[in-house]
Regions:
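A generic structural signal for short beta-strands and their flanking turns/coil linkers
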Residues: 20-24, 35, 70-75, 87-89, ...
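Hydrophobic residues in beta-strands and at strand termini
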Residues: 26-28, 79, 122
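Hydrophobic beta-strand-centered segment that forms part of the acyl-chain substrate-binding groove
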Residues: 55-92, 101-103
Length: 139
C-alpha cells in the first residue's frame, strides 16, 4: 500500500547524491496550507516551513535506511531569500553518519540561489524496531 502524500511536507525525488548528501525537492503551490495567513497580499513560504522540510528530509532518508531519526534543534540558521508560491526548492542535508547523534549541515536552494542554510542536530532513536515501508518491523 503506498504511503499517502503529505499535504504539509510534499517532498519528492528523495535521493542520495554521489557525494553522500541527502536531497529532496518540493514545490509548494498557492493552495498550500503554509500560505494561509502568511501573507494574504503577498504570499511567502514561512521560515519554519523551510526548517520542517529539512527535518522531513532527514526523517524520510533515515527510514529508507531502516533508522528512526529525529531532529532536536537547529543552530546558525540564516534565511537569505524569499520564496513565493510555485517555486521549486532543493533541500540538501549532510548524511547521518553511524552513531546515535550528529550535527548535519543543510542548505535550501531555489534556482541555484541559497534560500536558507544552517546546522541541525539529528538523533537516532535507539532500541527501536527497524523501519519498513509499512511501519515498524515486528509490530
Amino acid at each position: 500500500m503506498p504511503i499517502p502524500r503529505d499535504r504539509w511536507l510534499p517532498l519528492k525525488d528523495l535521493r542520495i547524491t554521489p557525494e553522500g548528501r541527502w536531497e529532496s525537492r518540493v514545490r509548494l503551490g498557492p493552495s498550500s496550507e503554509w500560505f494561509s495567513g502568511h501573507f494574504d497580499e503577498c504570499a511567502l513560504v514561512p521560515g519554519v516551513a523551510l526548517l520542517a522540510l529539512a527535518t522531513e528530509t532527514v526523517k524520510r532518508q533515515g527510514r529508507e535506511q531502516g533508522r528512526l531519526l529525529e531532529v532536536s534543534g537547529f543552530s546558525g540558521v540564516r534565511f537569505r531569500r524569499l520564496v513565493f508560491p510555485g517555486e521549486e526548492l532543493l533541500i540538501s542535508v549532510g548524511a547521518m553518519p553511524p552513531g546515535s547523534e550528529a550535527k548535519l549541515d543543510f542548505h535550501v536552494t531555489c534556482h541555484g540561489n541559497t534560500v536558507a542554510h544552517g546546522e541541525l542536530k539529528a538523533t537516532q532513536e535507539l532500541g527501536s524496531f527497524p523501519v519498513t515501508d509499512r511501519g515498524f518491523a515486528g509490530t
